[in-house]
């Protein structure tokens, strides 16, 4: 089964069932005759932007609505303390323990300006695709990490 069909089936299952985690989702997929590896399901969940939300005291996996991107952008923006750069790299300082989330968010945006990110505890190193586009990269980061 191709990725598009899996994504459709995952969305369908999450709309019809209360699913707490990937293991439960994997079981439901298998019950419906789909053979999916855990690693593949994990990638699918990341690509779909699935979130775990608390509902009536327990967690449930959900597909984010169209408003979720704006909300996530605002939440990630709150975690950023500063953005600085030199001629070759950009450094983002975050609240303690939040660098991984900020770096992961930037990676998921898949900008052609970003070659990659490396995150520590409170610092994200953003490696530009070209050192000639540092100012464009900084503007891009600011626009995608706004608090509003």
UniProtKB/Swiss-Prot annotation:
Function: Regulates arginine biosynthesis genes.
GO molecular function, one term: DNA-binding transcription factor activity
Family: Belongs to the ArgR family.
Chief place where the protein resides: cytoplasm
Natural source organism: Chlorobium chlorochromatii (strain CaD3)
GO biological-process terms attached to the record: L-arginine biosynthetic process; protein complex oligomerization; regulation of arginine biosynthetic process
Gene: argR
GO CC terms: cytoplasm
The name this protein goes by in its record: Arginine repressor
Pathway(s): Amino-acid biosynthesis; L-arginine biosynthesis [regulation]
Keywords assigned by UniProt, alphabetized: Amino-acid biosynthesis, Arginine biosynthesis, Cytoplasm, DNA-binding, Repressor, Transcription, Transcription regulation
């Amino acid at each position: 089964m191709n990725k598009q069909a899996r994504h459709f089936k995952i969305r369908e299952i999450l709309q019809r069932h209360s699913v707490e985690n990937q293991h439960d989702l994997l079981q439901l997929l298998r019950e419906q005759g789909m053979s999916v590896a855990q690693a593949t399901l994990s990638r699918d969940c990341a690509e779909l932007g699935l979130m775990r939300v608390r509902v009536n005291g327990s967690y449930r996996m959900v597909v984010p609505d169209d408003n979720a991107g704006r909300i996530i952008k605002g939440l990630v923006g709150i975690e950023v303390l500063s953005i600085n750069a030199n001629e070759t790299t950009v450094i983002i300082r975050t609240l303690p323990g939040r660098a991984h989330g900020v770096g992961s968010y930037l990676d998921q945006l898949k900008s052609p300006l970003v070659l990659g990110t490396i995150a520590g505890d409170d610092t994200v190193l953003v490696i530009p695709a070209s050192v000639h586009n540092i100012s464009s990269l900084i503007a891009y980061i600011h626009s995608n990490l706004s608090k509003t």
